[in-house]
Each structure stands twice: as C-alpha cells, then as structure tokens.
Amino acid sequence: MKIALIATEKLPVPSVRGGAIQIYLEAVAPLIAKKHEVTVFSIKDPNLADREKVDGVHYVHLDEDRYEEAVGAELKKSRFDLVHVCNRPSWVPKLKKQAPDAVFILSVHNEMFAYDKISQAEGEICIDSVAQIVTVSDYIGQTITSRFPSARSKTKTVYSGVDLKTYHPRWTNEGQRAREEMRSELGLHGKKIVLFVGRLSKVKGPHILLQALPDIIEEHPDVMMVFIGSKWFGDNELNNYVKHLHTLGAMQKDHVTFIQFVKPKDIPRLYTMSDVFVCSSQWQEPLARVHYEAMAAGLPIITSNRGGNPEVIEEGKNGYIIHDFENPKQYAERINDLLSSSEKRERLGKYSRREAESNFGWQRVAENLLSVYEKNR
C-alpha cells in the first residue's frame, strides 16, 4: 500500500521540536514502512530538508501557511491508497475531495469532536468520510461517540507508546548505572524520590503534591519531590502560578527540586533515578504519555482518575488510581505506602515494565495501526 501520514500544522516530523503527535509519527512510520510505502507530511522547519528519505520513510515538509491546502495538492498528485489524518477531523472532507479513491483513517489525540471544536454537520460529514477512527484512549472515543452515535461502529482505541530501548529500569545494570549517575549529578544520594513530569500549570495539579508533602515528610524525612517541566515545556519564564509553586516549595526547601526544561534524551535517566511516579492531573486528560514513560522505566505509578489516565493502571499491580483527585491527603497516603516498602515498589515497577513491553512499545503500536489499515483496505 501507498500510505500518507498527515501531521497537524503545529510542529514538524521528525520531532525536532517535540510534540506528542510528532513523536508518535516519527516512531511508527519506519515500522510501517517495512511493509508499505510511507510518506509523512508536516510543516517546514529550518533544521529539516523540504523533502528527504530517512529510515525508509519519505518526509515532505510544506509551508505552514496554507498547509492543509498544500497537503491536498500533494494527495491529488501522488494517488495514495490510504490517508491517515492526525487530529484534524475538519480537514478530512476537504482532503477526501483531493483523493476520492483513498481510504481515510482519522486518529484523534484530544477532544477534537467537542462542541467548541467542530459543528454537528462537520462532525457527521467527517465520520461519513472515514473508514475508521482510532483514538488514543477509550475516554477520547467516548467523547466522540456520546455526541456522534454514528461513529460507534468506526471507533477503535489504539494506545500510544514509548521507545522501550531508551528506558532502563533500576534493576538492570544500565539502569543502576544511570540511576547512580543522575542522583550524583543532582546531589540526591540516599533520597526517596517522588517524580512529577509535565507542564507546571494548575490543571496538572503540582500544587496538590506540594500540599501533600508535609504528610509525606512526617513519615519519610528522606523524601525528595522532583518536578520536571516549566509553564510550557521549553518556556522557563515564571508566571504567577509557577511563582506560587516555588513559594510552596520554599516552605519545604530541603525536600523539593524544580528542574526546568530538560532535553528529551535526558528524560529517561530522570525516571530511572526515581522511586515513585505521580500524575496529579486535574483535567480530563486524553491519556498523558508520561504514564508510558514511567512504565518503561519500571516505576510504580500513582495517577488521578481523570480522562484516559486510569486506563493503563491495574489497581495494586502497576500502581494506584486517586479517585478523590483534589485531595492532597489521598496522594500522601499512597505515596507513603509505596515509600515504606522497597519490595512493593519493585513488584509494581516490574509489572509496569512488563506491561510496557507487552502493550506499549512502538512495535506494538505500529502493529495495531497496521491491522486497522489492512482491515480497511
């Protein structure tokens, strides 16, 4: 098959500037290209050639202005068998006109079928135009089918994934080495490390973890809570909320570390140095990719019962779900429980890693997408 993968207009692929969708496409495209001819369309970037072939994948970079129109022209010219559009349902009918003989697949990574994103008529036309809608979580699928019942027979969850080769759990030789190196660099030897990775914004709930900290310190005076991220990744300018977090952190300054934007290649070592991973998200999140990263690193996970996040947690096996997600004491209780038992942390962490290896490696994601493509072709 001749397959087109269409990124959004936000960031380029390969993912030289980050982005969940861009990371996703860069990971799965070479694996799909082992069986099919694959072209990835995304916006231009000064660090990327306009057209190049890497790992068997054709990359075409188009002007950000009028990007959708430029993609349509490419589809019309190249005659693809299957077109996979990422996260832009409103584009599908227009692109379909340029490639009427192609099968269209839509992947939905956020609440793109919400009332403020797409009209009823546009949504129905999009659903009629695609053979299948793949979503990153059951939660996102439900946001579509609850409003558009006609999508039920077409909607399927295909979870995202993680590069298993870059994450080394602490019980491996490489993981032990990375753990010691990172702890040494940050001066954290002998600490029990609780890790938060994400944007420092109220909807992500880092303030709740800081409010939970006194109860944790009481039981574990050797705890260190590490926050990785800024207001937005790559933006280290302080806003009022981040200043508030720093004020809260200063009250327990010997137990809190803020690490602003780090290079993606350094992220795995920061997971490996940690003992417990916590996602305190307060909004209905599609399914934060930090969960896959924590599993790959072999960490026990504590996550809030919001959006798709609980879908990858088996209660008591690879982590715990906080149902009273606004309550700092609930987080403190679960964190204390895990910090009190290295045996439990290791048991849950090993289950996490096995889950990642079985279900959330990029090879599995690519296989799941291929089954969708081949079924609909």
Curated annotation (Swiss-Prot):
Record's keyword annotation contains Signal:
no
Picking any one GO biological process from the record gives: sporulation resulting in formation of a cellular spore
GO MF annotation list: glycosyltransferase activity
Record keywords, A-Z = Glycosyltransferase, Sporulation, Transferase
InterPro entries hit by this protein:
Glyco_trans_1, Glyco_trans_4-like_N
Q: What top-tier enzyme class does this entry carry?
A: transferase
Q: What is its EC number?
A: 2.4.-.-
What family does the Swiss-Prot or TrEMBL record give for this protein? Belongs to the glycosyltransferase group 1 family. Glycosyltransferase 4 subfamily.
Q: What is this protein called?
A: Spore coat protein SA
